[in-house]
UniProtKB/Swiss-Prot annotation:
It holds the Pfam family TACO1_YebC_N. The keyword Transcription applies. This is Probable transcriptional regulatory protein RPD_4171. Keywords: Cytoplasm, DNA-binding, Transcription, Transcription regulation. Gene3D superfamilies: 1.10.10.200, 3.30.70.980. GO terms for molecular function: DNA binding. The keyword Cytoplasm applies. InterPro entries: Integrase-like_N (IPR017856), TACO1_YebC-like_2nd/3rd_dom (IPR048300), TACO1_YebC_N (IPR049083), Transcrip_reg_TACO1-like (IPR002876), Transcrip_reg_TACO1-like_dom3 (IPR026564), YebC-like (IPR029072).
Length: 248
């Protein structure tokens, strides 16, 4: 399991305090508004907006909040956010991609550069590490939604590239070009997924020792806590022992 997936699992197990929950809702609302502003305000016709709405539902964001974020885009009274991708190397030379929506480029760049530097890494230029990742669609379902064989058969029939099934659920991967069609076909068969989004999937992962792993998780925690940061991806793996320690 790639480091960013391990990190998200740890954060989920730890649960969210009210302040963290509020920050999560704020980030989700920002993504919903931007997605609705860039495309149609109808989630059925706007894959990015649909992905954002699904993510919001998974976080138990109130329906009123979701609708308000969409209406904000329609009304034209929303702030203007720039979409920026930051790339760099974290501790141990691990490649890291940060996706942000910001209304202040200088502030965001300064903050994110500081996080990388303090962790022992360095922020690079756009394109410096993204060649080590694939821009891929992922559709996730809970394990109880289908057997591994049924999910695999349905995914292949829909045109997916790969399927990973475990006790934690099913992950279906599809190219950018086929993502929307695959997601639509699976939803017709299994219902709404718990996640459907475009991600940066590492082509290969690097196993790091526990000391480096802790530094990387700390870097990712700082990045994720920043108001402008939407997603963080990295190409590392850590031991099960460190996973258990960080989740404890």
């Amino acid at each position: 399991m790639a480091g960013h997936s391990q990190f998200k699992n740890i954060m989920h197990r730890k649960g969210k305090q009210d302040a963290q929950r509020s920050k999560a809702f704020s980030k989700l609302a920002r993504e919903i508004t931007v997605a609705a502003k860039l495309g149609t305000p109808d989630p059925a016709m706007n894959p990015r907006l649909r992905a954002a709405v699904i993510a919001a539902r998974q976080e138990n964001m109130p329906k009123d909040n979701i609708e308000r974020a969409i209406k904000k885009a329609i009304g034209g009274d929303s702030e203007n956010y720039d979409e920026i991708r930051y790339e760099g190397y974290g501790p141990g030379g691990v490649a890291v991609i940060v996706e942000a929506l910001t209304d202040n480029r200088n502030r965001a760049a300064s903050d994110i550069r500081s996080y990388f530097t303090k962790s022992g890494g360095n922020l690079g230029e756009t394109g410096s590490v993204s060649f080590m990742f694939d821009r891929t669609g992922v559709i996730e379902y809970d394990a109880g939604k289908a057997s591994a064989d049924d999910m695999l058969d349905a995914a292949i029939e829909a045109g997916a590239d790969d399927v990973l099934s475990s006790e934690g659920g099913h992950e279906v991967f599809a190219s950018q070009e086929t993502f929307r069609d695959v997601a639509k076909a699976l939803e017709a068969k299994f219902g709404e997924p718990r996640k459907a989004a475009l991600i940066w999937k590492p082509q290969n992962t690097v196993a790091v020792d526990d000391e480096t792993g802790e530094k990387l998780f700390k870097l990712m925690e700082h990045l994720n806590e920043h108001d402008d940061v939407q997603n963080v991806y990295a190409n590392f793996e850590v031991s099960d022992a460190l996973m258990a320690k960080m989740a404890g």
